[in-house]
């Protein structure tokens, strides 16, 4: 049986590598380096969930979240970001995020969040 697809959108290579180490055994990982790339990839893949950073070049992650929720409202999007404010978390949830995980994160946080939205 093929692995479920996860789309990971983060501009930091080190973070993408961390996700790869944590998730590659269980998921078919697709990576986007910015929001424009993520939106383009979503035209051709159907991920089970998405991990999305907020602070990125070209298009802010919150804008990407809004666009994704307009075109694919059922796609679970987990925000993983360096922003640790309650206000930012509330805005993300209000805009359709399934979960909000501040960086730095632990492996178990990521695995638990993905498991919760992909049941």
Q: Where are the regions a protein language model picked out?
A:
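Receiver (REC) domain active-site loop signature in two-component systems and cognate sites
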Residues: 56
